[in-house]
A protein has these predicted regions:
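C-terminal regions of mature proteins
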Residues: 21-33, 218-220, 371-481
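Scaffold signal of the M16-like zinc-metallopeptidase fold and its non-catalytic homologs
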Residues: 21-26, 92, 164-213, 234, ...
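An aromatic/glycine/proline-enriched structural segment found at the starts
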Residues: 22-29, 218-283, 442, 446-472
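M16/MPP (pitrilysin/insulinase) zinc-metallopeptidase core fold and M16-derived inactive scaffolds
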Residues: 64-126, 166, 186-190, 302-318, ...
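M16/insulysin-pitrilysin zinc metalloprotease superfamily fold
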Residues: 93-96, 124-154, 284, 303, ...
């Protein structure tokens, strides 16, 4: 027993001594940089020009194949959208198998195959991969473009365009591209109702026959493969794919504006402004300052700890998030700093965005910011290289951009070598705050007055990117026209005062399901000026609001609270069941044009009501 006690005491004292030597107030020293060994992919080229890259990885019994057609961008012109439609129609049957049988086979194997205008993708368990690659190859090389499927896809495309007609975000992205690249640039054209209606089945077939060729394509196969057997399979399935001469389009040079300007797109239905500060850049993967540019953008707007986010969201509360992106591209790169903000702070947001961009250019970032950004990139890179598909993509980039074989193995070293001067020089070169387009899509009547007080010239464009004039904010109110006149005309239009007065009670019942739980909201109103609003969950009333014409109360979860005098006054003013009768006492504030309709805007207390 004494021996055991002595041993325990000795162990306790040793533990105390070890703990006493640990200083938990200081950060532990970092270990050595991880060494990245990506391995050597297997590469070969078929006689038709198809370049094949195979990456072995036996961690999971799965294989994927990604075919990427690396054509130079081209202009689709009057039939913009034809390539997208062609890609959508691939995989809907081949010359040897119907659409339904094709899909049934893919489902039977528990696999995935998808086609698009610039390639295809397939993945499956290892034992089914030969069958899946065969289906994928058949769908790519022997498609059937039927009139029936074409008509269906045409209608789907038109329906999607129609549903986006009033989308502020869609209009913003569309016009941003038109202005940034130009209409004659492949990146600047867009699909429209007019261009889609001009597309014929023959156009789709011609697009496939012209551009869907192997001699500009890469096939990347990654996963649990036997290289020898897979190489033989690829040769068997793809050697018969006929190569062809692919026409090239001379891509226009993109240019920045001489001086920063505001490009405004008026959207009457916008409840917030879409802001994008954009300039063109010449940046390609592997450029000498590529890593410095990555880090500069990450510090400015790469995430939730970057400068734009911390300023516009955390400090000012203008937006849910503000970010920047630096797009490297062989044909036309761009820098963008963006935010979606409330109308009333649109001008202030522009000022803050520009302030952060110019601060990056004219003042060095701190050593701490640079170090944190490096660690973030290195950490993300180390995690990414654990994924087999990432390794396959790296191999593809090395081929596509003609990079050194050790480009990614030296990635960490090159990131760590970036200096404070390098970051500032990259910011000066790529963040052109002095030659940028500040593209704002929003509601002119709410934001233009303050934007006109900035130092920037404002140019106006419509939803298709065509130059236009400043939109009319309001129209003059005719002499003698009042809120009472407007409401009277509305009452007359819906049936007349007698019929309105005859309705003494209204009830609206709304049903919803939230995470499987049924919810019912009931709203009752009765003359003179009595209301009840009730929310019930699974039959139990969770919240209720009652007004009897003179007083009222609110209750929730068994707690009852009488209405305050201000709430009583507001309830009395509403004049239910038809609140419009109360609006007669409001003010006719303005006549506002919205989508070609002139709306009479009546202001009543804090409410604006639009009458057409």
């Amino acid at each position: 027993m004494k021996t055991k006690i002595a041993s325990l005491i000795a162990l306790f004292l040793t533990t105390v001594a070890i703990n006493a030597q640990i200083d938990r107030s200081t950060m532990p020293k970092p270990g050595p940089d991880p060494v990245v060994k990506l391995g050597k992919p297997i590469k070969f080229t078929l006689d038709n020009g198809l370049k094949v890259i195979m990456v072995e990885n036996h961690k999971l019994p799965r294989v994927s194949a990604n075919l990427s057609i690396d054509n130079k961008p081209y202009l689709e012109g009057d039939i913009a959208g034809v390539s997208g439609m062609m890609g959508s129609l691939l995989g809907r049957g081949t010359k040897s198998i119907s659409k339904d049988d094709f899909n049934e086979k893919v489902d039977f194997y528990g696999a995935n195959i998808s086609f698009f205008s610039s390639g295809a993708f397939g993945s499956s368990l290892t034992k089914y991969f030969p069958e899946i690659l065969e289906l994928m190859a058949d769908g790519m090389q022997n498609p059937v473009f039927s009139k029936e499927e074409f008509d269906k896809e045409l209608q789907v495309t038109l329906d999607n365009l129609k549903s986006n007609e009033k989308s502020v975000t869609s209009a913003a992205r569309r016009v941003e591209n038109v202005l940034t690249y130009g209409r004659n640039h492949p990146f600047g054209e867009f699909t429209s109702k007019e261009s889609v209606e001009k597309i014929t089945l023959e156009n789709v077939i011609n697009n496939y026959n012209t551009y869907y060729k192997p001699n500009n394509a890469y096939l990347v196969i990654e996963g649990d493969i036997d290289p020898k057997a897979t190489k033989a399979l690829v040769k068997d399935l793809f050697s018969g794919w006929q190569k062809g001469e692919i026409p090239t389009y001379k891509i226009p040079e993109t240019k920045n504006v001489s001086n920063t300007e505001i490009n405004f797109i008026n959207m009457d239905n916008a409840v917030q402004s879409e802001i994008a500060i954009i300039n063109n850049v010449d940046l390609t993967l592997g450029d000498d300052d590529y890593y410095a540019a990555l880090l500069a953008n990450n510090i400015l707007g790469g995430g939730g700890t970057a400068r734009l986010f911390m300023n516009l969201r955390e400090d000012k509360g203008y937006t849910y998030g503000s970010y920047s992106s630096l797009r490297q591209n062989r044909y036309a790169g761009t820098f963008r700093a963006t935010a979606s903000v409330r109308n009333m702070v649109t001008d202030s947001s522009v000022v803050e965005l520009q302030k952060e961009i110019n601060k990056m250019r004219y003042k060095k970032v701190s050593a701490e910011e640079l170090e944190n950004s490096k660690e973030e990139y290195i950490g993300g890179f180390v995690m990414d290289v654990q994924k087999p598909r990432t390794v396959a993509n790296f191999a593809l980039n090395i081929e596509r951009y003609n990079l050194p074989e050790d480009f990614y193995e030296n990635y960490i070293k090159n990131i760590k070598a970036v200096t404070l001067d390098d970051v500032q020089n990259a910011a000066i070169k790529y963040f052109r705050g002095d030659q940028a387009r500040i593209v704002i899509t929003g509601k002119g009547i709410d934001v233009l007055k303050n934007l006109e007080n900035t130092d920037y010239v404002i140019k106006y464009f419509d939803k298709e990117g065509n130059p236009t004039v400043k939109p009319p904010m309001t129209l003059p109110i005719p002499a003698g026209m009042t809120a009472e006149n407007v409401v009277d005309k509305y009452i007359e239009a819906i049936g007349g005062k007698d019929k309105v007065d005859a309705i003494k009670t209204t009830m609206i019942v709304s049903n919803a399901t939230i995470q499987g739980t049924p919810l019912v909201m009931t709203m009752k109103s009765s003359a003179p000026n009595k209301t009840l609003q009730e929310i019930a969950v699974m039959g139990n009333v969770m919240q209720k609001s009652v007004f009897n014409g003179e007083t009222g109360y609110q209750s929730a979860r068994g707690q009852k609270m009488d209405m305050q005098q201000a709430q009583i006054d507001e309830a009395k003013a509403n004049l239910v069941p038809f609140s419009d009768m109360a609006y007669k006492k409001g003010t006719l504030d303005r006549i506002e044009p919205i989508d070609g309709v002139n709306y009479y805007v009546v202001q009543f207390n804090d409410t604006e009501v639009f009458y057409d």
